[in-house]
A protein has these predicted regions:
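Interhelical loop/hinge segments that connect adjacent transmembrane helices in multipass membrane
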Residues: 1-9, 188, 197-239
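Signature of the first transmembrane helix
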Residues: 3-64, 68, 230-250
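Residue-level signature of transmembrane alpha-helical cores of multipass secondary-active transporters
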Residues: 8-16, 50, 90, 129, ...
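Helix-terminus/linker motif at the lipid-water interface of multi-pass membrane proteins
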Residues: 21-40, 109-116, 172-179, 237-270, ...
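Small-residue-rich hydrophobic transmembrane alpha-helices
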Residues: 39-99, 136-155, 260-324
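Short runs within selected transmembrane alpha-helices of multi-pass transporters and secretion channels
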Residues: 60, 129-147, 155-163, 184-197, ...
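Short membrane-interface helical motifs at transmembrane helix boundaries
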Residues: 96-127, 317-343
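Membrane-interface helix-loop junctions in multi-pass transport and translocation proteins
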Residues: 153, 163-196, 324-326, 340
């Protein structure tokens, strides 16, 4: 296994895990303070968040590939143009997702049979999250650029700071200020906004020639980003939409099952996070190899990445099987039905 691949993928994996903690922290705090009703609300809302994040990660991955190729070819102009178009795409994408999300989330929750006692909380949470979509797209754009340049540690720093802030705000807004699920949503988008602004300032210093005010439209760069990123985005959205439909069917069995499936899905997502991280590391390394014309080295990176991915997946599956019940109890240790259904869901999905 290529040591450089491990060095690049580990910070990416930790960064993605920490970034995913946004919703997990919301669920932990709300589950402990509000109870299973709030937990069911965020479990359903987080499914829409998964789809938004999938679209965002998929689209920005195209920018990461192009940035890596430009770096490998030492093409500073192409690199700058790609970064500009990636931000343009992120801005347009976030605007579309925000408008569409605000227009359909209520009808979607009704179609998903969200339990009546959790419906209003789910709507309130999702409304706030939709308004902060620009921060999600913006931060992932910066992360993709830095990863394409071979820097996987800086994104980890910024997402770590944001997660700590999210935890503090969650406890404060949901607890003493009694804002419920809405407080958890405000904590999340505030932390994401801080993460985006901080990483943007860093990128401006890291790339002296880059400025949001000097972005020029380059149709060929935009199409190149979409050519790589759009199929990935569609694939990820389709997978998460399938999970959304399953959640809708499970909601018919009541609040405990809805809460359990949401928790189980979140843990299952964490268990597979290394696959995305290693995939992004492979993308960055292969992009730079192809940009430099090193075809054989690119093939070796792919083989090493596949071996690493399979090895880690096997180890994670064993751990989840052994610790399924304690993991579910972290979110709600008071409801026997939530624990039973959650453990069954988790062990089935990770088998």
């Amino acid at each position: 296994i290529n040591p450089l691949l491990i060095k690049l993928s580990v910070p990416m994996m930790v960064s993605m895990l920490v970034q995913a903690l946004y919703n997990v922290v919301d669920m932990l705090v709300v589950g402990k303070i509000v109870g299973k009703t709030g937990l069911a609300a965020i479990s359903n809302a987080s499914m829409l968040c998964f789809i938004i994040n999938s679209l965002c990660i998929g689209l920005t991955m195209g920018g990461s590939v192009l940035v890596a190729q430009c770096k490998g070819a030492n093409d500073q102009t192409g690199q700058r143009d790609t970064i500009g178009m990636l931000f343009f795409l992120s801005l347009v994408g976030s605007a579309v997702v925000t408008i569409l999300g605000l227009a359909i989330y209520e009808a979607l929750f009704q179609a998903l049979n969200v339990p009546a006692n959790a419906y209003q909380d789910a709507c309130g949470y999702m409304k706030i999250i939709c308004c902060g979509t620009v921060f999600v797209f913006g931060y992932n754009a910066v992360c993709s650029i830095l990863k394409g340049l071979g820097d996987s540690q800086t994104p980890l720093f910024f997402v770590g700071v944001a997660t700590v802030l999210n935890v503090v705000l969650d406890v404060l807004l949901v607890g003493p200020l009694s804002m419920g699920t809405a407080g958890a949503a405000w904590a999340t988008i505030t932390a994401q906004g801080v993460s985006f602004m901080g990483s943007l300032v860093y990128l401006r210093r890291y790339q002296p020639g880059f400025s949001l005010r000097k972005i020029e439209f380059h149709r060929e760069k935009l199409l190149a980003i979409l050519k790589v990123g759009l199929p990935t985005a569609i694939q990820m959205v389709v997978v998460n939409t399938a999970y959304l439909l399953v959640t809708g069917m499970l909601n018919q069995f009541g609040t405990p099952v809805a809460a359990a499936s949401g928790v189980g899905l979140k843990i299952n997502t964490f268990a597979g996070m290394h696959c995305w991280a290693i995939g992004q590391a492979i993308t960055a390394m292969v992009g730079q190899c192809l940009g430099a014309g090193q075809i054989e080295r690119a093939r070796k990176v792919v083989r090493s990445g596949l071996l690493l991915n399979l090895s880690v997946t096997a180890a994670v599956a064993v751990v989840v099987q052994l610790l399924a019940e304690p993991l579910i109890c972290m979110f709600d240790g008071t409801s026997p039905e939530v624990i039973r259904c959650g453990v069954q869901y988790l062990r089935t999905c990770c088998s």
